[in-house]
């Protein structure tokens, strides 16, 4: 691991080892300088090495080297894309894309939403989200999703979540584990307002992102 640092003046304007940090901080203080530590990490910011075309990144420190951002992707301040993760574009990313996760074109991750990767409890399951999906604010998924899927705000779907499948008339069809629905398209995950039971309905209305969010004029 290494430390990215910047001191006032010409001292410590370099990358130092973690083991050097305590002494470097002490030396800076004795000289009346401020040593600012930006990160202690194995992965630097992606934009220090690669700047993709046609993207907007509100906070460059949230995109680690090894991430992929496709043309038309916007990553807002609280969005995060880990290494070996990808937003194929165009996408609006206000949530977290974990290591190994790929989201398809036109998919929107709402504020503080997340995807469960192999580094965050997902085991060996590779999570992907298809095209024109919406993961609402504070929601998330631990199963792969096909195209045109929606998870309502605040609902986190894990592989073992009990889900009641209902038809277009609202009639209950069967109860399954969420893993049994992995990879399917046109699913709408919501909670029953009275019981809190997780329901899966057919989602025939594709989510369209606001074109203005992806304008680079």
Predicted feature locations:
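Basic (Lys/Arg-enriched) interaction patch that binds polyanionic ligands
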Residues: 72-112, 131-132
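Single conserved hydrophobic/aromatic residue that forms the stacking wall/gate
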Residues: 1-12
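Glycine-rich adenosyl-nucleotide cofactor-binding module
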Residues: 22-89
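Long, low-complexity, charged/polar intrinsically disordered regions
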Residues: 13-23
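Glycine-rich hexapeptide-repeat left-handed beta-helix
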Residues: 98, 103-105, 109-217
